[in-house]
Amino acid sequence: MSGLKLTNVSYSVGEKHLLHEISFGQETKGITAILGPNGAGKSLLLSLIHGVIKPDMGLVTWNGVSAQKTKLSRGYVFQTPIVLRRSVRANLAYPLQITGKHCPATIDDMLKLSHLTPLADHPAASLSGGEAQRMAIARALITKPEVLLLDEPCSNLDPASTKLIEEMIRNFVADGGSVFISTHDLAQAKRLANVVLFIESGRLLEQGPADDFFAAPATQASRAYLRGDL
């Protein structure tokens, strides 16, 4: 992956300003955690980075090309996983079918990676929350994206499911992928991230190495957030 760049990005719904003139450049491979209190704009920022929505003002580019026009491959997993009314195997096959890349061996590899091989032919609707989320991540990975975007991937999941999902994320990064993850789980951000973006009330207040952010947050808002007071 080369560079992601946001330049003076703003987004509003009606009269409500949700993101305000956000600018940053990101070329570091690895895992970037987007942190901030409820309603800060984390999920919205993730959607803009992906390109599924366009900013009202400003530019979002990947390698100098707009997020809507770039050919950079990206996988996106929502907080509530989308489950098709078919088997787990068929859910994983779907992205390959629509891209004309159907490959049973690839599906088997993803079933193994997500620890879902024993459930391959079960209805996806019967999966637990953690299983469904692992399936959603595997489905996002199956077309071999360069970038993976995750919106609260471990929200309300048990520790065992969280551990398996973090293992999937680390494996993707070890293979050269880049991850942007929105999370409320500070412990998870510490475990995974090498870069942190901190936003509050739609404004980007901090960007930098995760170790620096957690050791010496630079703003009053980020200090309050880490104390649990925001």
Regions found by a protein language model. Name each.
Residues 159-161:
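Helix N-cap at the start of a conserved alpha-helix in ABC-type nucleotide-binding domains
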Residues 148-151:
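Catalytic Walker B motif of ABC-type/P-loop ATPase nucleotide-binding domains
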Residues 183-184:
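H-loop/switch region of ABC-family ATPase nucleotide-binding domains
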Residues 35-37:
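The feature captures the beta-strand-to-loop junction immediately N-terminal to the Walker
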Residues 104-119:
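Conserved ABC ATPase "signature" region
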